Amino acid sequence: MILAARSICLAVVLIGAQPAIASDNPSWLNKQMTFKQARRAILRAGWQPIRSDDRDHDYGVVSALHHKGVKEITQCSEGESFCNFYYRKQNECLRLITIGEQLPALKVYDWTSECPDE
């Protein structure tokens, strides 16, 4: 009985330590936005960019955006160029996914509550 109670307490502590997730449907974010509009809205809502590793930004869209000060970009696919950007607000994470190959043309494709691999 005591062992079971300790296991439950440990589970509660571990669950409490996990980051919470962002709202899956924030009213201030939509798929019609450009990346610049979405980024502005995300920052106004109190989210902070999660800075990615500078060593991973030596090519294409990722490099161009990183050099323009968009430090939260983590990767872009080749071809249609889906890009990932990560933000944090307290213990919540927000992953913004865009589509496009150049900054003015980047559009919001989707978003999730995923945290980057750390």
Regions found by a protein language model. Give the residues of each.
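Amphipathic alpha-helical segments
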Residues: 34-51
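Low-complexity, intrinsically disordered Gly/Pro/Thr-rich segments
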Residues: 90-100
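Short N-terminal segments immediately surrounding and downstream of signal-peptide cleavage
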Residues: 23-39
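Bacterial N-terminal signal peptides that target proteins for export
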Residues: 1-8
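A short, surface-exposed interaction/processing loop segment used at functional sites
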Residues: 99-118
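A cross-family detector of function-defining hotspots
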Residues: 46-91
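Sec/Tat signal peptide C-region and signal peptidase I cleavage site
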Residues: 18-22
